[in-house]
Amino acid sequence: MSLFNLKNKSILITGSSKGIGKAIAYQCAEHGAKVIISSRKLDICEQTAVEINTKLDSEVAYAIPANISDDDQLENLVNETRKKIGKIDVLICNAATNPFMGSMLDMPIEKFDKVMHNNIRSNQILCNLVLPEMISNEDGSIIIISSIAAIKGSPILGAYNISKA
């Protein structure tokens, strides 16, 4: 048995249409999981899902767009994931935002609130939406992607540093 056998696992990954999230989705699918590709733009999500499905010659990746700043879209993401792949065994919160670079002294409070909402609050909402099923099944995993910013501060990424700690 392989340490990385994800056969029959269903994984919801936010921020998975490109970058690290896309790589996570591909690796999970390659190891047998069904994956949900999610980010704000449907066309990019679909493109990533097609790319993964083509590389693996199997329909294992599905696109469901969601903006992590919108609570209703988060709820819809979880509901549509369940409709598409039946269950959620693993939630990977990868999506994040940083709309401001500069000194915290110059950061408008609206930008600070956006970072905290998108990088912390949205993860809490998603966890609350999937945890009851995981508790009921006595199985499941939640992974929240951090960043080097959590341990190495930056004078121009203050709020982002806080949100990743």
Predicted feature descriptions by range:
Residues 42, 65-76, 109:
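The beta1-alpha1 cofactor-binding region of Rossmann-like NAD(H)/NADP(H)-dependent oxidoreductases
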Residues 147:
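Residue(s) in the substrate-gating loop at a strand-loop-helix junction
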Residues 10, 15-19:
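Conserved glycine-rich cofactor-binding loop
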Residues 31-47:
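Conserved glycine-rich Rossmann-like NAD(P)H-binding loop of the short-chain dehydrogenase/reductase
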Residues 102-104, 108-116:
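Substrate-binding pocket helix/loop in short-chain dehydrogenase/reductase
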Residues 127, 163:
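Active-site helix of classical SDR
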Residues 104-105, 152-158:
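Active-site loop immediately N-terminal to the catalytic Tyr-X3-Lys motif
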